[in-house]
Amino acid sequence: EAVYASFGVSGVVDCDMDGNLLWQAAIGDGTAGFGSAASPVVYGDLVYVNASIESNTLFAFDKQSGRNVWKTESIMKSWTTPCIAEVPDGPPELILNQKNEIFAFDPVTGKKLWWCAGVEDYIVPVPVFHDGIVYCLGGRSNRAIAVKLGGRGDVTKTHKLWESTTGANVTSPVYHDGHLYWASDKAIGNCLRASDGEEVYRERLPTRSRIYSSIVRAGNKLYVTTRDQGIVVLAAKPE
């Protein structure tokens, strides 16, 4: 057992359960006004780190030794954490959303499998997937895009299912029962129908506080933590 953490320009660390440092790896020395935000992702024998801010690089480290197994560069304006998406009848894909493009990589080799035109602005929300489709939000223009997994090459015209002008700048969505839910930083609750991106509701929440946390579902409730006015609880249904 181990704990992996990313500290931006201070690098990535691996500690045992007693807090002893096992290894540390550098990921770059770049900084930005918002600081660093991406978390490490562990899958199989590798630890993935989106170091777009520190070095415009996506790294894959051996989780036992910290050795850099592979990396890909030119990752731009991406504060998001990658996700490992399960593909029906196919191998898993490592999904990373960045400014202008959504990428899928082979998690083991780092080979770029496909790419799709994305949000034309910086990206913060984490992609979510369900039943072979990945949903990517981001940008100050608040966009949302759905892409079918499993493609190869440029899939913009073949696998991009829909794009919506209802999205999120900072917060990540949650998928539940055919719908996507999230709360925007301006305290707006949002619900999209996942099948076609149709807006189901967009309503102001009962708080004046800003919201930068991602929504959490537990059972039939959605929990939204505000910046300074507690937690707002919503029903996990499209109304």
Regions found by a protein language model. Give the residues of each.
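Noncatalytic, solvent-exposed loop/strand surfaces
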Residues: 1-239
